[in-house]
């Protein structure tokens, strides 16, 4: 990028400030914005650098920024107008009114409920795959699906595969029910096979019948943190690594979920489950710290439900075991949180282990039962079809 000066063909210009399009521009904009909002009395969150918190007496405001898209929520309209005036005086910006659309996510408010959906984005994925007339299926992955890197012949359009797999990853922001299936196909993005493509098409066929579903957030009287965690054991046919998954509820609302292949091989099912417990406890620590910054501290221990008795025993019993001494770091981390009263690890029967949906393919009845527990609903009547 640039031009050649006729009189000084061997000279270069010194850049005095960042220009739009340069790789340094996003960082420069972020620093410029941060410096200004700090002068308004905001504090930058240590848990999330894109979150700014304003708390003075009875006035509270939260500001979330992603590049140049901003969400601002305040405790009063007076405070909102004051902050908007200050921001508009410093930066060229437009007030789009109440939150209705952010980063591809449609937001609808009805009474005391928020409905978050990416239904239009889901339909776009179906169209990009050329599957607008496909027949829907009841589940995104079959019960026997264990994809291998050697599954059949090479797929002839890896670019399309990667594009759709990446799009499905973004869709999991409001669709926790597909995260396990998406995680399984994304593992093979580097060298997709025909079987991997068939697995991806099954996810799209599932979306064909469920694209209307979205995430609901209700006003809740409870401020308790509750989590479910589960893991398969040596589920990957190539690496023999396990897949762990969890979901976290704040009151009655689902706020966090994950499905990931573990980074090491577990020597027992208890070890695989315990590593899953450590993962969700780490997430709970982050959420508790975030709530503390938001001036909403929790006073009660967060509950973690696990269906493996041995993993529960390890979390609270300070005994050294020959078979678990190699996972000492995770053991000490979880035990420390338990001893501090921050976390309690309790047993749940496997039939009611919601996190199963994040670690394996399930039969239709069980899948739909667990899906109904993930805050996924049809849109309110006034927004159906949007």
Predicted regions located by residue number:
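Mobile genetic element proteins and their domesticated derivatives, centered on retroelements
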Residues: 21, 33, 37, 51, ...
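Reverse-transcriptase-like RNA-dependent polymerase core
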Residues: 1-13, 31, 40, 55-56, ...
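C-terminal reverse transcriptase regions that engage the nucleic-acid substrate
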Residues: 19, 67, 94-214, 349, ...
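RNase H-like nuclease module associated with reverse transcription
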Residues: 101, 224, 242, 254, ...
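A short acidic-Thr-Gly-centered motif at the start of a beta-strand
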Residues: 5-10, 52-58, 213-221, 292-297
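Two-metal-ion RNase H-like nuclease active-site motif
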Residues: 167, 225-237
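Metal/cofactor- and membrane transport-associated sequence elements
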Residues: 1-92
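Alpha-helical coiled-coil heptad-repeat oligomerization segments
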Residues: 38-39, 78-85, 89, 153, ...
């Amino acid at each position: 990028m640039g031009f050649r000066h006729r009189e000084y063909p061997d000279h270069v210009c010194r850049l005095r400030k960042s220009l739009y399009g340069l790789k340094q521009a996003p960082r420069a904009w972020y620093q410029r914005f941060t410096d200004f909002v700090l002068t308004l009395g905001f504090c930058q969150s240590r848990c999330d650098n894109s979150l700014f918190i304003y708390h003075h007496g009875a006035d509270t405001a939260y500001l979330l920024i992603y590049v140049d898209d901003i969400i601002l929520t305040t405790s009063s309209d007076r405070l909102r107008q004051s902050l908007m005036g200050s921001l508009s005086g410093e930066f060229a910006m437009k007030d789009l009114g109440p939150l209705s659309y952010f980063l591809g996510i449609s937001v609808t408010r009805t009474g005391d409920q928020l409905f978050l959906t990416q239904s239009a984005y889901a339909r776009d994925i179906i169209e990009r795959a050329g599957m607008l007339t496909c027949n829907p299926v009841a589940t995104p992955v079959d019960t026997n699906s264990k994809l291998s890197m050697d599954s059949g012949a090479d797929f002839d359009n890896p670019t399309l595969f990667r594009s759709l797999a990446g799009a499905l990853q973004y869709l999991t922001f409001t669709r926790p029910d597909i995260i396990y299936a998406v995680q399984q196909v994304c593992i093979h993005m580097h060298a997709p096979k025909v079987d991997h493509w068939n697995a991806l098409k099954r996810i799209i066929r599932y979306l064909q019948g469920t694209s209307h579903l979205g995430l609901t957030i209700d006003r809740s009287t409870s401020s308790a943190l509750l989590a479910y965690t589960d893991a398969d054991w040596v589920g990957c046919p190539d690496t023999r690594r396990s897949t762990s998954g969890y979901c976290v509820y704040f009151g009655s609302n689902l706020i966090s979920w994950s499905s990931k292949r573990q980074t090491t091989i577990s020597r027992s099912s208890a070890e695989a489950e315990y590593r899953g417990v450590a993962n969700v406890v780490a997430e709970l620590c982050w959420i508790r710290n975030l709530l503390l910054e938001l001036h909403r501290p929790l006073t009660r221990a967060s509950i973690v439900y696990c269906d493996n008795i041995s993993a529960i025993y390890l979390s609270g019993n300070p005994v050294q075991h020959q078979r678990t001494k190699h996972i000492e770091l995770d053991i000490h981390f979880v035990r420390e949180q338990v001893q501090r009263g921050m976390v309690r690890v309790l047993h749940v029967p496997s039939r009611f282990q919601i996190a199963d949906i994040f670690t394996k393919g399930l039969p239709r009845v069980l899948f739909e039962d667990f899906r109904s527990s993930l805050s996924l609903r049809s849109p309110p009547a006034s927004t159906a079809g949007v």
